[in-house]
Amino acid sequence: NTPNTLMTRTFSKIYGLASLRVGWAFGPRSMIETLERLRSPFNVNGAAIAVAAAAMRDVAHTDAARGHNNRWMGVAVQRLRALGLGVTGESGNFVLPEFPDTPGKSAADTDAFLQSKGVIVRRVDNYGLPNHLRITLGTDEEMESVLNALTQFMGGSDG
């Protein structure tokens, strides 16, 4: 009974279906009716809807993805803090380590080093976080790669 609250969710994170551009909204009828009037006709195709519905029924996959995410969140936070980095954003599917504002060790320098190693992370300067990088939790191999590269860059061993 909260007339101005709308909950929205995507299928991009836990379900791994970002390319389908599908999601859902739950809220008061008046807000849903407004969304219906504003959205483009045929804004989600039938195949995307079918895949999203199947993903919602695949509880085993969702549980496995959540477990993988939780495990790597803990590992990533621990290893980043061991490198002396502050960590923000310990929920969701990414972490935001804060890098020193020191020439040679800044977020920009770190990003350039990671790119040279084939590791892509996201700069977040445009969100007012010039000393942070967004690291999305990935596969075991991807996580080992980014964490080992960061360890190497920050002056520790690579592994």
Language-model region placement:
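PLP-dependent aminotransferase class I/II
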Residues: 4-81, 85-88
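PLP-dependent enzyme catalytic core of the Aspartate aminotransferase-like
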Residues: 105, 113-117, 122, 126-159
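Thr-Gly-centered strand-to-loop micro-motif
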Residues: 9-10, 97-98, 122-124
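Short acidic/glycine-enriched loop/turn segments that link adjacent beta-strands
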Residues: 19, 91, 128-131
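Residue-level recognition of strand-loop junctions within catalytic nucleotide-signaling folds
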Residues: 28, 57, 100-101, 138
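Short, hinge-like loop/turn segments at secondary-structure boundaries
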Residues: 1, 24-26, 139-141
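Conserved PLP-binding catalytic core of the aspartate aminotransferase-like
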Residues: 70, 78-117, 133, 137
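Alpha-helical structural signal in soluble globular domains
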Residues: 1, 75, 79-83, 113, ...
